[in-house]
C-alpha cells in the first residue's frame, strides 16, 4: 500500500514539474514576442518620421505605366532654343549634354558621346601613371577591335592610337575625339533637333518616358561636371 502511494506521488510530482517547465517556456515566448513587436513598431515609426522630414525622398522623376522613368526637366524653352544654334552650345550645357545622351540611347549609339566625355576627362589627367591607366581603359573599351563600346573610326586613326597606346600622351585621342565629334555633329545632332526629346524641351512640355535598352553601367553625362579620376569608371 505504501508502495502504491509512493508510486502515485512520484507521478504527480513529475506532472507538476512538466507543467511548471511548460509554463516557464510558454511565458518566456510570449514575453520575447511582445518585445520583438515593440521593436518593429518603433523602427516603423522611425522610418515614417524620416520620410516626412526628408524632402529629397521624393525624387525628381515620375513613373510611367510601362515602368520607365521620365525625368522632370527644369530647362527653359529659351535655353533649349540656344542648343539649336550650334552643336558646341548643346554639349557645353549640362542639361543639353544629358538630353543629347538620352536621344543617342534611343538610337543605340550612346558610345559616341560616352567616348567624347571620356576623352574630355582624359585630358585632365595628372601624372604619367594616371595617363597610362586611363588611356588603356579608353582603348580597351572604345578603340580596340570588338571593344564593348567600339566607336566608328577610320583605319588610319585607329592604327595611330594602337601603335602609341604603350606610351600615351594627353593628346593620344585628339584625332579620334575630333572624328567622333564630327560624326555626331553632322549626323546625330541633326536628328536630335527633330526629335521629340528636343521639341518637348523647346516647347516647354513635360518630358516623355524613354524606352531604354538594358546595358551595363556606362559613363553618363551626369558625371561630366564632377568626374572621378578613378579608372574603374570605364571598366
From Swiss-Prot:
One of its GO terms (cellular component) is plasma membrane. Inhibits signal transduction by increasing the GTPase activity of G protein alpha subunits thereby driving them into their inactive GDP-bound form. Binds to G(i) alpha-1, G(i) alpha-2, G(i) alpha-3 and G(q) alpha. GO terms for molecular function: GTPase activator activity; GTPase activity. It is found in: Cytoplasm. Its main location: cytoplasm. The keyword Phosphoprotein applies. Expressed in peripheral leukocytes, bone marrow, platelet, spleen and fetal liver. The keyword Transmembrane does not apply. This is Regulator of G-protein signaling 18.
Amino acid at each position: 500500500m505504501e508502495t502504491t502511494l509512493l508510486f502515485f506521488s512520484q507521478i504527480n510530482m513529475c506532472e507538476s514539474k512538466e507543467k511548471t517547465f511548460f509554463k516557464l517556456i510558454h511565458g518566456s515566448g510570449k514575453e520575447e514576442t511582445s518585445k520583438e513587436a515593440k521593436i518593429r513598431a518603433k523602427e516603423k515609426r522611425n522610418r515614417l518620421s524620416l520620410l516626412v522630414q526628408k524632402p529629397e525622398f521624393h525624387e525628381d522623376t515620375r513613373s510611367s505605366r510601362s515602368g520607365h522613368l521620365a525625368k522632370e526637366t527644369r530647362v527653359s524653352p529659351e535655353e533649349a532654343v540656344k542648343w539649336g544654334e550650334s552643336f558646341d552650345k548643346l554639349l557645353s550645357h549640362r542639361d543639353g549634354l544629358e538630353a543629347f545622351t538620352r536621344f543617342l540611347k534611343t538610337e543605340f549609339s550612346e558610345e559616341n558621346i560616352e567616348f567624347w566625355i571620356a576623352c574630355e576627362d582624359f585630358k585632365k589627367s595628372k601624372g604619367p601613371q594616371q595617363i597610362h591607366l586611363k588611356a588603356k581603359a579608353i582603348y580597351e573599351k572604345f578603340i580596340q577591335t570588338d571593344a564593348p563600346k567600339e566607336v566608328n573610326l577610320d583605319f588610319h586613326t585607329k592604327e595611330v592610337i594602337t601603335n602609341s597606346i604603350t606610351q600615351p600622351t594627353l593628346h593620344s585621342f585628339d584625332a579620334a575625339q575630333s572624328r567622333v565629334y564630327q560624326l555626331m555633329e553632322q549626323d546625330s545632332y541633326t536628328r536630335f533637333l527633330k526629335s521629340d526629346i528636343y521639341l518637348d524641351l523647346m516647347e516647354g512640355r513635360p518630358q516623355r518616358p524613354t524606352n531604354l535598352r538594358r546595358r551595363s553601367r556606362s559613363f553618363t553625362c551626369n558625371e561630366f561636371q564632377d568626374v572621378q579620376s578613378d579608372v574603374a569608371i570605364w571598366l
